[in-house]
Amino acid sequence: MKKAPVTQTPVKDFFFRGLICGGFGPVVMGIIYFILHFTVEEFSLSGMAVFTAVISTYLLAFVHAGASVFYQIESWSLGKSVLFHFSLLYVAYVLCYVLNDWLPFDLLSLGIFTAVFAGGYALILLVISVSIRMTVRRLNKQLR
């Protein structure tokens, strides 16, 4: 199956996607903080904590949206695309979570996070792969 062509250079496409979707990170963070305000007794944040969360979640959403460009670089194998996509997302999530003190910076916490992240990533990749295979089979049957 041929990959969709990149509309621009991969770098431009990465930044374009990031700019389009980056704002969703702070919106999600705001919704979570709003819910915490009503569910956690005496929930409060410093101005610096809010600033750090807004900037880091924007950058996380930016990177997350842009990283999908790795799957559209036609000269790359699927394995290389997965490796770069996974690695970039992993580093972005770890940095965001550690900077916001949402994840302690110790070996045990990072190990657990890594296992959960890798397992979740593998599960999502499996679901997408099965979905694509089922769609291809259905389309091939329709062509016969």
Label every model-predicted segment.
Residues L36-G79:
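Membrane-helix boundary/interface segments in integral membrane proteins
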Residues S44-V50, K80-S81, D106-V116:
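Non-cytosolic membrane-interface motifs at loop->transmembrane helix junctions
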Residues M1-V40:
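N-terminal signal-anchor transmembrane alpha-helix
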Residues H85-L110:
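C-terminal halves and exits of single transmembrane alpha-helices
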Residues F34-E42, V98-P104:
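Juxtamembrane "helix-exit" motif on the non-cytosolic side of transmembrane helices
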Residues G30, F34, G66, F70, ...:
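Alpha-helical transmembrane segments of multipass membrane proteins
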